[in-house]
């Protein structure tokens, strides 16, 4: 219960408000029929999209309100919402590593100090900021996770920026990279951040 009330709900409220600020719908209205640029009619879904989106991303549950996994402009209208949603998926796993580092560090400190644990552990810590923030073990795990993320992001970005050779042979321009299956609004770079962190 404490995790829900002290971590998930506050992050969900803040993240949901940020998504609403950027244009993600948050209402209880029904679907709206709009006229498109081509003159056709289109049904646009509405509802509590922002609240469900941020909960989906914090819990890495997948799916989505519309079922397109944040690939629609309704669930993900701007680059800022894209970054909010991507980083919210990395928030809790990163916090777990920090928590682990702090828990292990405190136990190690108490084991070394014995009965004088309070005086030794609560004294002024002369270690670096990262060692104090993550703990020694947490810093190592977080660095390993970060290195794997950067390597994966680099490989994905390089591969996708090369374009599709089959489409190049067909005479299609590949100057923007491989845009097949990518969100045109965000391009290759923003799309690859989403792929690399999963």
Question: Model features per residue range: what roles?
Answer:
Residues 198:
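Calmodulin-binding IQ motif helices
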Residues 1-195:
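Membrane-proximal intracellular helices of multi-pass ion channels
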């Amino acid at each position: 219960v404490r995790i829900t009330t002290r971590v998930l709900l506050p992050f969900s409220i803040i993240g949901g408000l940020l998504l609403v600020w950027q244009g993600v719908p948050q209402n209880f209205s029904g679907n709206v029929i709009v006229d498109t640029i081509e003159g056709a009619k289109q049904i646009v879904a509405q509802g509590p999209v922002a609240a469900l989106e941020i909960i989906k991303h914090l819990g890495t549950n997948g799916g989505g309100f519309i079922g397109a996994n944040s690939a629609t402009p309704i669930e993900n209208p701007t680059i800022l919402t894209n970054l909010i949603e991507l980083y919210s998926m990395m928030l809790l796993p990163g916090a777990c590593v920090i928590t682990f580092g702090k828990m292990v560090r405190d136990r190690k400190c108490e084991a070394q100090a014995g009965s004088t644990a309070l005086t030794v552990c609560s004294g002024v810590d002369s270690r670096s900021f990262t060692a104090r923030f993550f703990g020694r073990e947490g810093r190592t795990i977080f660095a390993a996770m970060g290195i794997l993320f950067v390597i994966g992001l680099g490989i994905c970005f390089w591969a996708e920026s090369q374009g599709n050779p089959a489409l190049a042979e067909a005479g299609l321009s590949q100057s923007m990279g491989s845009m097949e299956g990518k969100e045109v609004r965000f391009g290759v770079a923003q799309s690859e951040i989403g792929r690399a962190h999963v």
